[in-house]
């Protein structure tokens, strides 16, 4: 019996490492040994079971004596050697070795990164993750110790880095927005500077900002009249009674715009000179300009407006004398000619009805005279509006030429105050002449329209007085535009006198 027990233990010790190597053939041998042990045969089955382990290589026998850990490692090596170099076994072992090497590499790299981060934290003075976590817990009132233990040591530095990146991002946004605002401000200032240097754009911007000028009002009235008359069938006949169209036809609007430009330029020059002076020089110049403005007033207009003129020769003589006091090369011949033409037409229109009444013609001839009178009412009204527009346009043209000659003429032979007084008297004379001319036209209308109804005659008379009043206001506005021209002429003349 002892021999059998020894044989069984020997077989079991030999088969044990083979089962750990997951080999199928030794298991079969173990089963055969058990069956032989159970049988009552004495020694023949044992000899057959011992032959098979002897065929194993010497390396497998040596592993049986090693400890359990060494036997497991050696068993793994024998399996890798005994398995044929094909199938899933080969690829599985290769994948395991690859994963093990990759995990080792990752661990090494992670350890190196953690070392670098720790060095960066110490050099930059960044607190450790544990300190940051304790501060956060103290601030938020967290008391969980497990969360503190499980928190990764990399979260602290990355949290600091994320905070820094957020700050940089917000700073970048503010810098970009501030830069855009600065560019917008610079662009606006640049456009303002360009606009100041561009006379065309500057003039347009000035016209948009400032109140409407006289020329603009007249041009708008002209455009409205053109639109209104364009819808009428009898445009040629209606055009004769529109003041704005007639005023532009006689070049009055063009001369008024040119006079406004000269006045605006002179006003800018005067302001710049006043800004450059200071002290006693500034006060002295202001007092002299105030005296010039007082001499430039139209106070005499109300006093002399009631006086009546007797004939055209007096007007022509007076306007010529006043113009000679300005000492300019231009003469008021065109203005006097327009005025004389209007009075001659009035005389001829009033003479026809008187002659017809004196002759005492028959009833048929009286009917013809009624038709003539009816036509003469329309003609008188149309010619009255035309004469007022022509006389006003000639007056503004005279002021424009005077301003140009004063600015660009040679040395003055007369003082600026004397010129201002002469221009003031000239303006008063022109306004009075317009009033007298309108009265002459209304008298002519009343005489020619004796048999007409009041509804037909009164609107014509009212229109003549209205246009005469408008003409006088246009002349007064043009006269006021001459004040800056005389002021800059006075300043230039004052600076030239000491040099002479």
From Swiss-Prot:
Signal peptide: none annotated. Belongs to the FAM114 family. InterPro entries: DUF719. It comes from Bos taurus (Bovine). The modification Phosphoserine is found at residues 93, 152, 215. Pfam families: DUF719. This is Protein FAM114A2. Keywords: Phosphoprotein. Residues 1-82 are annotated as: Disordered. PANTHER family: FI01459P (PTHR12842), PROTEIN FAM114A2 (PTHR12842:SF3).
């Amino acid at each position: 019996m002892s021999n059998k027990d020894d044989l069984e233990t020997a077989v079991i010790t030999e088969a044990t490492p083979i089962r750990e190597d997951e080999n199928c053939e030794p298991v079969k041998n173990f089963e055969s040994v058990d069956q032989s042990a159970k049988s009552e045969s004495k020694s023949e089955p044992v000899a057959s079971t011992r032959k098979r382990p002897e065929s194993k290589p010497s390396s497998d026998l040596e592993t049986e004596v090693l400890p359990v850990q060494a036997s497991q490692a050696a068993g793994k090596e024998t399996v890798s050697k005994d398995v044929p170099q094909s199938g899933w076994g080969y690829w599985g072992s290769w994948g395991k070795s690859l994963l093990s090497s990759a995990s080792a590499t990752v661990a090494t790299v992670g350890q190196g990164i953690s070392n670098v981060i720790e060095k960066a934290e110490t050099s930059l003075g960044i607190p450790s993750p544990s300190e940051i976590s304790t501060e956060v817990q103290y601030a938020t009132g967290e008391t969980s110790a497990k969360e503190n233990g499980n928190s990764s040591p990399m979260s602290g530095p990355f949290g600091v880095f994320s905070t820094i990146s957020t700050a940089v991002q917000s700073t970048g946004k503010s810098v970009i927005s501030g830069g855009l605002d600065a560019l917008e401000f610079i662009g606006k200032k640049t456009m303002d500077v360009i606009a100041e240097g561009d006379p065309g754009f500057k003039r347009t911007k000035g016209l948009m900002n400032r109140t409407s000028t006289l020329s603009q009002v007249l041009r708008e009235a002209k455009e409205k009249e053109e639109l209104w008359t364009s819808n009428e069938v009898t445009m040629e006949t209606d055009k004769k009674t529109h003041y704005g169209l007639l005023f532009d036809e006689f070049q009055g609007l063009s001369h008024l715009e040119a006079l406004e430009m000269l006045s605006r330029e002179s006003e800018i020059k005067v302001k710049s000179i006043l800004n450059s002076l200071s002290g006693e020089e500034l006060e002295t110049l202001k007092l002299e300009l105030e005296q010039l403005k007082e001499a430039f007033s139209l106070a005499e207009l109300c006093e002399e407006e009631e006086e009546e003129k007797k004939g055209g020769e007096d007007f022509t003589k007076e306007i010529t004398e006043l113009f000679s006091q300005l000492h300019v090369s231009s003469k008021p011949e065109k203005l006097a000619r327009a005025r004389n033409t209007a009075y001659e037409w009035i005389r001829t229109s009033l003479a026809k009805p008187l002659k017809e009444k004196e002759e005492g013609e028959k009833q048929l001839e009286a009917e013809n005279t009624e038709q003539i009178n009816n036509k003469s009412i329309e003609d008188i009204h149309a010619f009255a509006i035309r004469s007022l527009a022509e006389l006003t346009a000639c007056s503004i043209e005279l002021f424009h030429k005077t301003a140009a000659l004063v600015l660009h003429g040679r040395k003055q032979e007369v003082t600026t105050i004397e010129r201002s007084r002469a221009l003031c008297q000239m303006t008063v004379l022109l306004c009075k002449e317009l009033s007298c001319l309108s009265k002459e036209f209304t008298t002519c209308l009343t005489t020619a329209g004796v048999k007409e109804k009041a509804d037909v005659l009164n609107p014509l008379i009212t229109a003549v007085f209205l246009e005469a009043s408008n003409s006088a206001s246009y002349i007064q506005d043009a006269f006021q535009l001459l004040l800056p021209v005389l002021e800059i002429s006075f300043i230039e003349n004052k600076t030239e006198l000491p040099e002479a």
